[in-house]
Amino acid sequence: MLSIQQRYNICLMAERHPKWTQLELAKWAYETFQLPKIPSQGTISRLLARKSTYMNCKEHEKDANRLRKPNNLLVRKILQEWISQSLWNGIPITSPIIQDTAQAVWHRIPAEHREGNGSFSYKWISNFLSKMDVNISVLDEELPKTPKVWTFEERDVLKAYFSKIPPKDLFTLDEAFLSYNLPLDYAQYEASSIQRRIEVATVMLCSNLDGSEKLKPVVVGKYDSYKSFRNYFPNEPNDPVSQSMLGTKMAKKFDISYHSNRKAWLTSNLFHNWLVRWDKRLVAVNRKIWIVLDDSCCHRIINLRLQNIKLVYTSSNSKFLPFNWGVWDEFKTRYRIQQYQALIDLQNRISKNIQNKNKSERNECIPNGKKCLISFEQSQLTMSNAFKFIKKAWDDIPVDAIKANWKSSGLLPPEMIHLNENVSMAFKKNEVLESVLNRLCDEYYCVKKWEYEMLLDLNIENKNTNFLSTEELVESAIVEPCEPDFDTAPKGNEVHDDNFDVSVFANEDDNNQNHLSMSQASHNPDYNSNHSNNAIENTNNRGSNNNNNNNGSSNNINDNDSSVKYLQQNTVDNSTKTGNPGQPNISSMESQRNSSTTDLVVDGNYDVNFNGLLNDPYNTMKQPGPLDYNVSTLIDKPNLFLSPDLDLSTVGVDMQLPSSEYFSEVFSSAIRNNEKAASDQNKSTDELPSSTAMANSNSITTALLESRNQAQPFDVPHMNGLLSDTSKSGHSVNSSNAISQNSLNNFQHNSASVAEASSPSITPSPVAINSTGAPARSIISAPIDSNSSASSPSALEHLEGAVSGMSPSSTTILSNLQTNINIAKSLSTIMKHAESNEISLTKETINELNFNYLTLLKRIKKTRKQLNSESIKINSKNAQDHLETLLSGAAAAAATSANNLDLPTGGSNLPDSNNLHLPGNTGFF
């Protein structure tokens, strides 16, 4: 059997003689290693298939016959990082300290990465240090020596040293953070909700002095595989192994080196492996090189054994590396130019598509040259886009720019560098590129533009140079195989110990809830539920954009009002081109109704999909939708934009949704709402019949009335006046429909604490009474039986039936919920400490605690679902007051005119005027 050393040498010969056949390699191995027989062609083939593994093996592994996976691999990686930076910073460490640190690290890592019981013996520590080439017997007495770190004042010594090195063999490298999906609308960047969604990747660049060798960029992301990678490999299997390999295939496609960890940081382990791999190839061609780098934490390696690479460390505080003198600014400038060009291209395509569509329909609402705003979801780049832009930006940096930066750094004698033009020793920027970037900043239509100088000096793009904490070391060592799917609803059992929140159960509502849809021409109707997890954040973003309209550096939005308004109106219903925009569009709302017996559709001032905002994935798109036509798709799949029938009227419109305060009112927590309702507990509680339909009607009415104080307010009509007109008109209500005042008070109290509606099969005939006493135009979608007579149940009877089947007091429910939450948090803390061996508990006790903990989670989940189903019903105390006024007036009218009300027998006979409407053509029921 071939040893690791022999396999490594065969791989070296394959690197040195790429034209050799596998048979020639086998003969060479037979003669060189004095083997008993010639290795077979299959043996050489399998060996070369794992060439990267054998080329990256460490010195202590070469004597073995096979590579074995060590136990507690993650602990070893973290401990190696910790020991390296401790020794580098002169912190004394001993074997007992290393043992305690290893045990602490073992308890910090996730349970799936743990092996053994967390106990590390002296022998284990000794073997571990020997693989790092650290003698444990000497470690207790004297720290290993670290490499020399050169300061800026010592650069004259470096000049004399570097003057003896051939320019092609003198390299430099440096890394920096790159916020690859940075929003180029500064108003979006200022929104804290969007800042949390900005992703950062680490990019390392390396080149020699004369620019003849520019190594492929090293990129470190957060996941081994991103969802966007499937744009280039759509036919790959969906199993976890194939999914995790997409990152390697993407790196090979774009000719970059890709790695990942949770922090997206370049660690010393990754850097060490990268150096070892390069050193093996240099040994194969018998070439020696020198690398100039800084002493940041990711470069700190102890006892690095490299044969053909010499590292020259400089102080990271002085920042006199060549790349700091202009290469990084030029790289970022070229990256942002590509990003701006892609966004401007998307805006132009949308505008051109809509203009062509208008011409075909003889609609000239958008003047030529007008553009539309693009939301953050449409403008953010993915990692696959970043790969493409990073590679192109690095390849486009000219050789003279690299030479000029070497000369400006002052590390080399002037005679070593020959340029086509004189370059001063001062810092020199690429003024041509910066002028292009500045022009694109002005050309891109947005709420508030970036200053191009700020784009090159972001705080989030400053790399780490300090001592890393243990928690940071743990996070930077864990590798996540695949990017999580944020579009799916969270699972109910996903509870975090450190931040226990019952809101994780909010997405598990039953699907029998009515889907409320409101439409208005000035708000985006394409609020798709598959992107609903970002709904609230998008609302804050729109609010942030509005607040910046008056900024001095912002674009003039008023110049494009006509285009934006047209886009907003055009997106209400693409299939319906007629009708008054101010009137309810019933046809556009038919598709939003669910299959319940009685469906309620209310025409309001806000286009909000409540189930979408609650992350209810009831309408997952199977085909490409408007949100699929974004800048990322334009970069990865430009063919999607070539269809002549493509309609982009619903794409890229950054609609001005209501402010975040509106949603906080509509979706306020059940606790706050029930505290308001608790003040009415002293009222009588006469039991009334139940009706699911009117319970739903009450919830919609409550949500509608709650929005009256927002940016586009509408007032609540005077119900007493309306009902008094009804009594004056000569019509009367049947005495069987009369409701006592105690019952009305009971309804006011209990309507804020309904836990669940009973009798879902009841289908009352929905009728609304207008100011003249005649039934209003039907807004409730359930058909009215043509055979019904005047004795049919009236609207008041339906309203009376909405309050039966009440759950226990809302105060009691919420009190029990809060108690369960507190107990669950306490049990979670206890089990966490027990798992870390901070407290000693028997196995039976831990099992009992775990059983109780899971039982509490189920109770919390059930209660949370119960409260969430009524969250829209109980949001407004003011709505309850108006409803009480309505019912009180109705009861008074019923007492005086009991048998004079004649209702029509068919929905087609309903009159078209004098509806009970809210201002803004919005029906109350």
Swiss-Prot record:
Record domain HTH CENPB-type: where: 63-138
Note: Present with 572 molecules/cell in log phase SD medium.
Region entry Disordered, spans: 510-596, 674-693, 904-925
Listed Polar residues bias regions: 513-537, 565-596, 904-916
UniProt keyword Lipid biosynthesis, yes or no: no
GO biological process, one term: positive regulation of transcription by RNA polymerase II
Biased composition, class Low complexity, residue ranges: 538-563
Gene3D superfamilies in the cross-refs: Homeodomain-like
A Pfam family per the record: DDE_1
GO function terms (MF aspect): DNA binding; RNA polymerase II cis-regulatory region sequence-specific DNA binding
Protein known as: Protein PDC2
Origin superkingdom: Eukaryota
Task of the protein: Essential for the synthesis of pyruvate decarboxylase. May be important for a high basal level of PDC gene expression or play a positive role in the autoregulation control of PDC1 and PDC5.
Entry GO terms, CC: nucleus
Species of the source: Saccharomyces cerevisiae (strain ATCC 204508 / S288c)
Bias type Basic and acidic residues, positions: 674-686
Keyword entries, A-Z: DNA-binding
